[in-house]
């Protein structure tokens, strides 16, 4: 994922319609990670307006809520099992040279050029975290990843919670 990002100048990330904690957390987690570690990349996040409960996340005010008619080198979709979940931003997906999907839904139909799908994972944030260099994750990224994990595990109550889920959440808590 990071090799693909480094080779891209215009880079777009997006989650699903009616964004929940995992969607917002994964899109902003990747956004903050790339801004910190690949500052030469132009990164844009497109989402429908998230709930105000996520206003504490770094990058929340940088989200664009309407599609732009422009070309993207790379388009990353997070927490989406199918293309119909990326409306109203389908044109952005179609205008990209390369597409990547990072997801955890068993129903994912592998619609992107490259698909990182782990149905055994609790959340897209958990899958996304496994693509990161742990030493390059900062507090802003950690808050986003933790938010997504908390939301999709019901604060660790749901059966999707695993030891790996808890280990990652613990690492994120240690960062602040």
Residue ranges and their predicted role:
Residues 20, 30, 54, 76, ...:
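Divalent metal-coordination and catalytic microenvironments
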Residues 1-7, 11:
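Single conserved hydrophobic/aromatic residue that forms the stacking wall/gate
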Residues 43-45, 99, 145:
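Hydrophobic/aromatic residues located in beta-strands of well-ordered beta-sheets
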Residues 19, 23, 80-82, 106, ...:
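Short, glycine/acidic-enriched loop or turn micro-motifs at the edges of active sites
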Residues 12-70:
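Anionic-ligand anchoring segments at beta-strand to alpha-helix junctions in alpha/beta enzyme folds, i.e.
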Residues 46-48, 78, 102-104, 119, ...:
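Generic beta-sheet signal
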Residues 29-36, 109-176:
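A structured phosphate/pyrophosphate-recognition subdomain
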Residues 58-114:
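Active-site cofactor/cluster-binding pocket
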């Amino acid at each position: 994922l990071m090799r693909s990002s480094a080779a891209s100048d215009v880079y777009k990330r997006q989650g699903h319609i009616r964004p929940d904690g995992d969607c917002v957390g994964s899109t902003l987690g990747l956004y903050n990670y790339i801004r910190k570690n690949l500052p030469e990349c132009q990164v844009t996040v497109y989402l429908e307006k998230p709930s105000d409960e996520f206003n504490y996340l770094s990058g929340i005010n940088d989200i664009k809520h309407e599609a732009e008619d422009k070309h993207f080198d790379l388009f990353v979709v997070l927490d989406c099992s199918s293309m119909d979940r990326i409306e109203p931003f389908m044109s952005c997906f179609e205008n990209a040279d390369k597409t990547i999907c990072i997801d955890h839904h068993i129903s994912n139909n592998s619609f992107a050029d490259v698909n990182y799908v782990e149905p055994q994972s609790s959340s897209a944030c958990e899958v996304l975290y496994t693509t990161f260099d742990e030493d390059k994750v900062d507090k802003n990224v950690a808050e986003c990843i933790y938010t997504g994990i908390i939301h999709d595990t019901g604060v660790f109550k749901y059966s999707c919670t695993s030891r790996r889920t808890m280990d990652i959440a613990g690492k994120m808590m240690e960062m602040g």
